Amino acid sequence: VYHKNNRISTVVSATNKTLSFNKKWTVANGMVQLATAFPQAKIVWCNTHCQENLNLKSIEVLFHHNKMMLSYCPDDNSYLGSKIGYVEESPFIKVNKKVSYPTWQMSSAVGVIHAAVLLEIKDKIKTDCDFDYYLNSVAKIGMPLGLLCYSEPKLLTETTIEKSSKASVFDLFKFVKEHYRTRWLFLLLLNFVVYEFRFPVV
């Protein structure tokens, strides 16, 4: 699934056949629809900026288990940014981009997941949201349930730094509200006031 600006641009099968799709779909919705149509397939997503460097050959080796989710963000900063560290101090936050690294922080730049996983959680996550938000939600929900999520640099043959999508303050608070206990929402707000010297208007 090649995409740009939160919309699908092209869908290509493993046999290099171009597949039809609804241009009104968000990328997340399109992936769920593809998972429904091809429930045994590995679904790869790639931003058009990274298309020339997509390492499809590596996926067969790297993606050795159906309960895996691999992704890679060439940008130094993740979608949710460093401020997610206000509510979580786990090793999953500071990702080593040079090696395969366990983390729930996924990226719309490039990645792969099995259709069965998307079908399993399709009723738990809305698909009308930003694609990065959707991917991070999938991993955040999936990891405690046994989904193996990794940042994997080998998904790209060459790393080119592209500005990736970043969460707004509203999206950050929304993510914390959906995936953490309520007290962490108040802690995030407190940290914004104390360390950012501002009261976030969301």
Predicted regions and their residues:
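Active-site-proximal specificity loops/subdomain of glycosyltransferases
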Residues: 1-40
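Mixed-charge (acidic/basic) macromolecular-recognition segments
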Residues: 123, 157-173
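Non-catalytic protein-protein interaction scaffold segments in large eukaryotic complex-forming proteins
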Residues: 84-86, 92-93, 106, 133-140
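Conserved donor NDP-sugar-binding/catalytic core segment of glycosyltransferases
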Residues: 8, 32-85
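Catalytic donor-sugar/metal-binding loop of nucleotide-sugar-dependent glycosyltransferases
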Residues: 108, 127-130, 136-159, 177-188, ...
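C-terminal, non-catalytic tails of nucleotide-sugar-dependent glycosyltransferases
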Residues: 2-12, 90, 167-202
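A recurrent flexible, glycine/aromatic-enriched loop bordering the glycosyltransferase active site
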Residues: 77-80, 89-113
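Conserved nucleotide-sugar donor-binding catalytic segment
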Residues: 102-109, 113, 118, 122-130
